[in-house]
C-alpha cells in the first residue's frame, strides 16, 4: 500500500480557523496513490449551509461530490473547512454549487468530477443543481447519489 506524503499540508493535525468566506478558504491536496487505477472518491455533506444573498436567511443543502482522481486527492479536513466557510456567505444556490465544483477541478485536475447539490426549499421550491466535467471514465463504478427528490410531508 503506498504511503501518502502529507509533508506539505498546513491544516491536518493542526488547530485551524474557518475562513471568513469561500474566496479565501484554502483547499489542500495530497498525492493520489494507485496510478493507472480509476476509482471514484465520494464526499457527502448532508448539512451544508450558506446564506440567501437577498434576505440573509440560512439555506441548507445535501451536497454529494464524486470524482475520479488523476494525480491528486483533496485533503478532507481542508474540504470540510472550505465547505464550512460558506456558513456566513451570501450566494444563490447555483453559485455556491458550481463554485465548489470549479474550485475542486482547479485544485485537483481530476479525470472527472460531478456535484449534486440538493437544496431544501426556499419559498416553497427546492432547487437542485447538477454539474459534471464530462463523461466519467469507462468502467468506473458510479453509484447513484442516493438523495431522494424533495417531497415535503405529502
From Swiss-Prot:
Record's keyword terms, sorted: Cytoplasm, NADP, Oxidoreductase, Queuosine biosynthesis
Top-rank EC class of the record's enzyme: oxidoreductase
Catalytic site: 52 (thioimide intermediate), 59 (proton donor)
The reaction(s) this protein catalyses: 7-aminomethyl-7-carbaguanine + 2 NADP(+) = 7-cyano-7-deazaguanine + 2 NADPH + 3 H(+)
Keyword Phosphoprotein: no
Pfam families: QueF (PF14489)
Family annotation (InterPro entries): GTP-CH-I_C/QueF, NADPH_dep_7-cyano-7-deazaG_red, QueF, QueF_type1
GO biological process, one term: tRNA modification
Predominant location category: cytoplasm
Pathway info: tRNA modification; tRNA-queuosine biosynthesis
Gene Ontology MF: a single term: preQ1 synthase activity
Binding site for substrate: 74-76, 93-94
Protein location: Cytoplasm
Keyword Repeat applies: no
Similarity comment: Belongs to the GTP cyclohydrolase I family. QueF type 1 subfamily.
PANTHER family given in the database record: NADPH-DEPENDENT 7-CYANO-7-DEAZAGUANINE REDUCTASE
Primary role: Catalyzes the NADPH-dependent reduction of 7-cyano-7-deazaguanine (preQ0) to 7-aminomethyl-7-deazaguanine (preQ1).
UniProt-recorded name of the protein: NADPH-dependent 7-cyano-7-deazaguanine reductase
Organism: Rhizobium rhizogenes (strain K84 / ATCC BAA-868) (Agrobacterium radiobacter)
Species lineage: Bacteria, Pseudomonadati, Pseudomonadota, Alphaproteobacteria, Hyphomicrobiales
Underlying gene: queF
Amino acid at each position: 500500500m503506498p504511503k501518502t506524503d502529507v509533508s506539505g499540508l498546513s491544516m491536518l493535525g493542526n488547530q485551524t480557523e474557518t475562513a471568513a468566506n469561500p474566496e479565501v478558504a484554502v483547499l489542500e491536496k495530497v498525492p493520489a496513490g494507485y496510478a493507472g487505477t480509476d476509482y471514484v472518491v465520494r464526499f457527502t455533506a448532508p448539512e451544508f449551509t450558506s446564506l440567501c444573498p437577498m434576505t440573509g436567511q440560512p439555506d441548507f443543502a445535501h451536497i454529494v461530490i464524486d470524482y475520479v482522481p488523476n494525480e491528486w486527492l483533496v485533503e478532507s479536513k481542508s474540504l470540510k473547512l472550505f465547505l464550512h466557510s460558506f456558513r456566513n456567505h451570501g450566494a444563490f444556490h447555483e453559485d455556491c454549487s458550481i463554485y465548489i465544483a470549479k474550485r475542486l477541478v482547479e485544485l485537483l485536475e481530476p479525470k472527472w468530477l460531478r456535484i449534486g447539490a440538493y437544496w431544501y426549499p426556499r419559498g416553497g421550491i427546492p432547487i437542485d443543481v447538477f454539474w459534471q466535467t464530462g463523461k466519467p471514465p469507462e468502467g468506473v463504478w458510479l453509484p447513484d447519489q442516493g438523495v431522494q427528490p424533495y417531497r415535503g410531508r405529502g
